[in-house]
UniProtKB/Swiss-Prot annotation:
<dbReference type="GO" id="GO:0005737">
    <property type="term" value="C:cytoplasm"/>
</dbReference>
<dbReference type="GO" id="GO:0009073">
    <property type="term" value="P:aromatic amino acid family biosynthetic process"/>
</dbReference>
<dbReference type="GO" id="GO:0009423">
    <property type="term" value="P:chorismate biosynthetic process"/>
</dbReference>
<comment type="function">
    <text>Catalyzes the transfer of the enolpyruvyl moiety of phosphoenolpyruvate (PEP) to the 5-hydroxyl of shikimate-3-phosphate (S3P) to produce enolpyruvyl shikimate-3-phosphate and inorganic phosphate.</text>
</comment>
<keyword id="KW-0963">Cytoplasm</keyword>
<feature type="binding site">
    <location>
        <position position="165"/>
    </location>
    <ligand>
        <name>3-phosphoshikimate</name>
    </ligand>
</feature>
<feature type="binding site">
    <location>
        <position position="120"/>
    </location>
    <ligand>
        <name>phosphoenolpyruvate</name>
    </ligand>
</feature>
<comment type="similarity">
    <text>Belongs to the EPSP synthase family.</text>
</comment>
<feature type="binding site">
    <location>
        <position position="388"/>
    </location>
    <ligand>
        <name>phosphoenolpyruvate</name>
    </ligand>
</feature>
<feature type="binding site">
    <location>
        <position position="344"/>
    </location>
    <ligand>
        <name>phosphoenolpyruvate</name>
    </ligand>
</feature>
<dbReference type="InterPro" id="IPR023193">
    <property type="entry name" value="EPSP_synthase_CS"/>
</dbReference>
<keyword id="KW-0057">Aromatic amino acid biosynthesis</keyword>
<dbReference type="GO" id="GO:0008652">
    <property type="term" value="P:amino acid biosynthetic process"/>
</dbReference>
<dbReference type="InterPro" id="IPR006264">
    <property type="entry name" value="EPSP_synthase"/>
</dbReference>
<feature type="binding site">
    <location>
        <position position="21"/>
    </location>
    <ligand>
        <name>3-phosphoshikimate</name>
    </ligand>
</feature>
<feature type="binding site">
    <location>
        <position position="167"/>
    </location>
    <ligand>
        <name>phosphoenolpyruvate</name>
    </ligand>
</feature>
<keyword id="KW-0808">Transferase</keyword>
Length: 427
C-alpha cells in the first residue's frame, strides 16, 4: 500500500472503534453469565471475531450485526465440549483468557492460533492454571500453542505474578470464578483493570487491595448491557499524528479514559503537547471523554517503571513521537515488548531507521534522539504482520518527505479495520 507522505495538515473529528480489551471481555463474561448480554460499539476486528468464533464452538449463541453483539449466556455449567479446535487467530488475549475459563470446565479442548501466536509464551498462564488443577499439555511443556486442556474442579490459588500483565491476571481471576475459595493475584505494578470492573458489572464480586486482586468462587454472573468506549490504544495513533503533523487539529470522540490505560496522555502532556480532554463522563464502568490535540513543540522524556503497563501497547507510536521531540527520549523497563505480536523493540527500531530516525535498541527498550526529519526516497516499510507497527508507520509516513510503501498493511484489521479510511478523512 502506498502511504500519504509530506502531509501539510490533519484536521477533523473521528470516533475510533470500540476498545479491544473490553470487547473481548464482554463476549467472554456474557457467555459465562445467565441471561442475555447486549454489547454496543463492539470492535469487529479480527481478534475480537476470533473470540466470538471460539465461544460459538463452545455452544454459546452469539449474534453480531456490525458493532452490536447479542450474547445468550450459557450460565453455570452451560459451556459445551467443542467438536473442533478453538482457533484464536492472532489474539493473545483470546488465548490466555480463554485458557482461564477452560480450566474450570469439565471437558477437553484444543487451542491453536496463527504463526505469531505460536511464538508467544503461554507458560506464564499455563503454570498457575496447572497449580489450580487444570491439565494442560502443549509444545515445550505447554509454553507454546497448540495446547490441549482438560479442566474441572479447581483449587483456589494465591499467585504472585512476576510480570504486570492483565492477561495473566485475568486468566487466573476467570479461573478463580470456578474455584471453591479465594483466588488472588499480586502484581509488581498495576496492569489494566477492565476484568475487575466488568466482573462487577456482570454482578460478580472482586476485591482490590493495592496491587493484589482477588475473587471468591464459585460465582454466578448475570447478563447485562455494555457500551464499549473508544479504544485509547487506537486513538493513540491520531493523538500522535495531531501533535507532529504541521498545522493539525484532531478531535477524538468517546475515548475510554480508564486510568490504567492513559499513559499515552501522560507522556504527551510531559512532552509539552497541546492536548485537551472534554465531556468526561462515566459509561457504565468506564470513564469516557473527547480528546483534542494540536500540532505541538515537543521535548524528550524518560519513560519507565509504573508507567510502562499503562502504555505498553502505545510504545511503537510513542517511539515515533520521540523522533520529533528535542533531546534524547529513553524508554526502559519494557521487556514485555519482545513477546508481543512481534518483538516490538526490534521491529520499531528496524522500521523507523529506514525512515532516518536516530533510534537504537536497548535490552529493555530503546533510545531516540530528536528532533529528526524523516525521509522516504521510495522506501518500503513492513508491518511484520503487527497491527500496531503498521499504523505507526502510516503516521510516520505523514511527516516523511518522498514516497513510502507499506507491506502487509492488512495487519491493521486486527484492531482497527477502518484505520486508513479514518486517516484519509483527516487529510
Amino acid at each position: 500500500m502506498q502511504l500519504p507522505t509530506n502531509v501539510s495538515s490533519l484536521r477533523g473529528m473521528i470516533e475510533v472503534p470500540g476498545d479491544k480489551s473490553i470487547s473481548h471481555r464482554a463476549v467472554m463474561l456474557g457467555a459465562l453469565a445467565s441471561g442475555r448480554t447486549v454489547i454496543d460499539h463492539f470492535l469487529p476486528g479480527a481478534d475480537c471475531l476470533s473470540t466470538i468464533d471460539c465461544f460459538r464452538k463452545l455452544g454459546v449463541d452469539i449474534r453480531q450485526d456490525g458493532t452490536t453483539v447479542v450474547v445468550e449466556g450459557a450460565g453455570p455449567g452451560g459451556l459445551r465440549e467443542p467438536a473442533a479446535v478453538l482457533d484464536v487467530g492472532n489474539s493473545g488475549t483470546t488465548a490466555r483468557l480463554l485458557l482461564g475459563i477452560l480450566a474450570g470446565q469439565p471437558f477437553h479442548a484444543c487451542l491453536v492460533g496463527d504463526e505469531s501466536i505460536a511464538k508467544r509464551p503461554m507458560g506464564r498462564v499455563t503454570k498457575p492454571l496447572r497449580e489450580m488443577g487444570a491439565r494442560i499439555d502443549g509444545r515445550e511443556g505447554g509454553n507454546y500453542t497448540p495446547l490441549s486442556i482438560r479442566g474441572g474442579a479447581l483449587r483456589p490459588l494465591r499467585y504472585t505474578s512476576p510480570v504486570a500483565s492483565a492477561q495473566v491476571k485475568s486468566a487466573i481471576l476467570l479461573a478463580g470464578l470456578f474455584a471453591d475459595g479465594v483466588t488472588s493475584v499480586a502484581e509488581p505494578h498495576r496492569s489494566r483493570d477492565h476484568t475487575e470492573r466488568m466482573v462487577r458489572l456482570f454482578g460478580g464480586e472482586v476485591n482490590v487491595d493495592g496491587l493484589t486482586v482477588s475473587v471468591a468462587g464459585p460465582q454466578r454472573l448475570r447478563g447485562t448491557h455494555i457500551y464499549v468506549p473508544g479504544d485509547i490504544s487506537s486513538a493513540a495513533f491520531f493523538l500522535v499524528a495531531g501533535a507532529i503533523v504541521p498545522n493539525s487539529e484532531i478531535t477524538l470522540k468517546n475515548v475510554g479514559l480508564n486510568p490504567t490505560r492513559t499513559g499515552i496522555i501522560d507522556v504527551l502532556t510531559q512532552m509539552g503537547a497541546d492536548i485537551a480532554i472534554d465531556n468526561v463522563r462515566n459509561e457504565e464502568t468506564e470513564p469516557v471523554g473527547d480528546i483534542t490535540v494540536r500540532t505541538s513543540t515537543l521535548r524528550a522524556v524518560e519513560i519507565g517503571g509504573d508507567l510502562i503497563p499503562r502504555l505498553i501497547d502505545e510504545i511503537p507510536i510513542i517511539a515515533l513521537l520521540a523522533t520529533q521531540a528535542e533531546g534524547t527520549t529513553v524508554i526502559k523497563d519494557a521487556s514485555e515488548l519482545k513477546v508481543k505480536e512481534t518483538n516490538r523493540i526490534h521491529t520499531v527500531v528496524t522500521e523507523l531507521k529506514k525512515l532516518g530516525a536516530d533510534i537504537e535498541a536497548t535490552d529493555d527498550g530503546m533510545m531516540i534522539r530528536g528532533k529528526t526529519p524523516l525521509y522516504a526516497d521510495g522506501i518500503v516499510v513492513d508491518s511484520h504482520g503487527d497491527h500496531r507497527i503498521g499504523m505507526m508507520l502510516a503516521v510516520a509516513a505523514c511527516i516523511a518527505k518522498g514516497t513510502v510503501r507499506l507491506e502487509r498493511s492488512e495487519a491493521v484489521a486486527v484492531s482497527y479495520p477502518a484505520f486508513f479510511a479514518d486517516l484519509r478523512s483527516l487529510l
